[in-house]
C-alpha cells in the first residue's frame, strides 16, 4: 500500500466523524491510459519479460472500469468511515499478467528474466534518487519496491460486494484483452 495512501487513511481516521468519507483500496489497477502495467506490455513487445523474486507471488488485479463502478456505488450506497478492497475477486500468480499480455500481443519471442529482490532494491533506490534530481516521480521508486517485494496480495472484496453491490465485470483475461486492444488503437504499441 502506498505510503501517501496510508497517511491519508490515518489522517481520515484521526478526524473521526468530522468528515464523511469512504476509502476504496483498489489492488493492481490496469487498463487504458494506466502507465505502470503498460510498461510490461511494451517490454514484452520488445521481447523481454522482467520479474523479481524467486518465491511464489499471489497478486490481485482490478480493471479500471470496475474501479469506476465501485466509486459510483460507494457514493450511492457506502457508509461513512468504511473501507473496501477492490479486485476482480480472483488471485493470480504474478506471471499470469505477462502470460496474458504475451498472448494478446501475438506471442512474440521473448526472454523471461527473473532477478533477485535485491536487484529491484538497487533499481528502485537509484530510480528514487534520479526522480528527485529531475523533480519527477519515477515508476520504479522506493514505494514501488515495498509493493513489489510483497509475496501475498490477497484481499477480501466481500464487504464491497455485500454493502455496495459491487460486482466486477472484468477478470484479468478480459481486461488484458481490452487493454491491449486500446494500446494498439491509440498507438501506444
Model-derived features: where do they sit?
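Active-site Tyr-X1-5-Lys
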Residues: 1-22
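Substrate-positioning beta->alpha
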Residues: 3, 7-8, 34-39, 53-75, ...
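Flexible, glycine-rich beta-alpha linker
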Residues: 19-39
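A short C-terminal helix-loop "cap" of Rossmann-like NAD(P)-dependent dehydrogenase/epimerase domains
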Residues: 41-52, 107, 133-139, 158
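Residue-level signal for the nucleotide or nucleotide-sugar donor/cofactor binding architecture
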Residues: 59-65, 92, 155, 170
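Conserved C-terminal active-site "lid" loop/helix of NAD(P)H-dependent oxidoreductases
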Residues: 64, 99, 124-166
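Mid/C-terminal beta-alpha module of Rossmann-like enzyme folds, strongest
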Residues: 74-139, 173, 177-180
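Amphipathic terminal alpha-helices
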Residues: 155-163, 167, 171-189
